């Protein structure tokens, strides 16, 4: 018996592993209405996900296929749950998850502490008390060791001034301090108290002035002088160019070769930034400038089903 055209298309799509999410309507209209014989042909045709047990005469699922489908079906559910949460709780849980994962996820703590408003970061710390019966600062201090601890505790403890006044002389002085620290210590600049003080106490507008003065003093870009893999670089780019930061991690999450962890960044960025129209518009503009297509086009191209529709709905909130 020949495989129906609809199931043949579905087989090709699943075998290719293209996109994220699941086209629920296609599954309902094809698999849901298919005959038993058709589903057997479907299993035989999908060799990437099914293997034939010749001794027992049936086609069994590869374990990785089961995990793959569970993950793809869960993307929409995860996004909805995260969107329904209070933003403070959402950020508190993100920080807790990062601490559980360890050093490879500490950049998420930097993201939360450096891209949120002073009130939202304070709210996340309050939520942390309620959820985990300890302070965020205390938990970070007990889990993180070495020079990273001082920076991370300082960043999450910050309550930055958000007014429009800047003492330019002070920003220039801080730029000189940072220039000397980066020149003499490189990545180890994060160990210097003055560097931590500047990054954890100064307003974001002050840091923008510092950035301008640093580039004039050094004749080179501050962000290019620090290793891109370091927490110091993560903090700088989140504080100075958040739209660039989010655009890059969105693009990484939409890459066909992205790993499971990286693909999850997509949901995180959308649900945490969608309520902030100005920020989301800056991200959309930066993404378009960097990659030559709109974020909406990329989502339409790469994502499937209800997950795609939900992301596009969140994206349209800032239109």
From Swiss-Prot:
Residues where Phosphoserine occurs? 277
Annexin repeats sit at 1-75, 86-157, 169-240, 241-316
What is expression of this protein induced or repressed by?
A: Up-regulated by salt, osmotic and oxidative stresses. Up-regulated by abscisic acid (ABA) and salicylic acid (SA). Down-regulated by heat shock and dehydration stresses.
GO terms, biological process: response to abscisic acid; response to cold; response to heat; response to osmotic stress; response to salt stress; response to water deprivation
Q: Name one GO cellular component term.
A: plasmodesma
What is its biological role? May be involved in osmotic stress and abscisic acid signaling in a calcium-dependent manner.
Name the family. Belongs to the annexin (TC 1.A.31.1) family.
Please identify the protein, giving its name as recorded: Annexin D4
The organism is Arabidopsis thaliana (Mouse-ear cress)
